[in-house]
Regions:
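Short amphipathic alpha-helical segment within the helicase RecA-like ATPase core
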Residues: 1-199
């Protein structure tokens, strides 16, 4: 086998709770970073948690690895650790052509969720002076280049005052930078589907 490192992990049986599966792949991701892996191939096998299928497993592996190789280093010194894993390959066997297509989509979905988790981590890890309302707004608006279905509406203090958002504005009154509020809409579902709203 042409691999610099081979990691053998004691697997789980189908009765193991979901958090045990997540913890196992989190450990694999962290080990990949510590070994400074650039390419990582994982063979999850055919055993899945009870009431889950192989597509759930593939999505979970992609999501968990992507979101756990993340290391924040932007404002740290040059010697700080940085993530090294650039490529993940999930190895499967015995899939029909249609199942393989579904498996690839599951991997893409997992990777996308992992990227979203990493974006939230990144914004949360930024120091306050690197994460002001204007900076966050700029970063979010930049995402519309990659996601054309993403729509951003911004409101300044005067507009929020007219909407009666006094409680919101009272929180930011002592800040040096004026408050901003964004409404972010992603309309990727069907027109008759109920929307999902997150407030925070």
């Amino acid at each position: 086998i042409a691999a610099a490192n081979i990691l053998l992990v004691n697997g789980l049986d189908s009765s193991a709770p979901t958090h045990k599966w997540l913890s196992m792949y989190q450990s694999i991701a962290h080990k990949g970073n510590s070994l400074k892996c650039k390419d990582m191939s994982i063979m999850p096998g055919n055993t899945c948690p009870t009431k889950k299928d192989e597509f759930w497993l593939i999505e979970m592996v992609a999501k968990t690895i992507e979101s756990n190789v993340y290391i924040f280093s932007e404002t740290k010194n040059k010697t700080a650790s940085r993530p090294t894993v650039k490529k993940l390959t999930i190895l499967t066997s015995g899939l029909t052509p249609s199942a393989l297509t579904k498996a690839k989509q599951a991997a893409k979905t997992g990777y996308a969720i992992g990227e979203g988790v990493n974006t939230a981590k990144y914004l949360g890890d930024l120091p306050a002076n690197h994460c002001t309302p204007k900076i966050i707004e700029k970063k979010v608006k930049a995402m519309t280049k990659d996601f054309p279905k993403l729509k951003i509406k911004s409101f300044n203090e005067q507009q929020m005052q007219k909407m009666g958002m006094g409680s919101f504005l009272s929180v930011s009154r002592g800040s040096e930078e004026p408050a901003r509020m964004m409404v972010i809409e992603y309309k990727g579902g069907k027109a008759n589907e109920k929307p999902i709203a997150l407030v925070g």
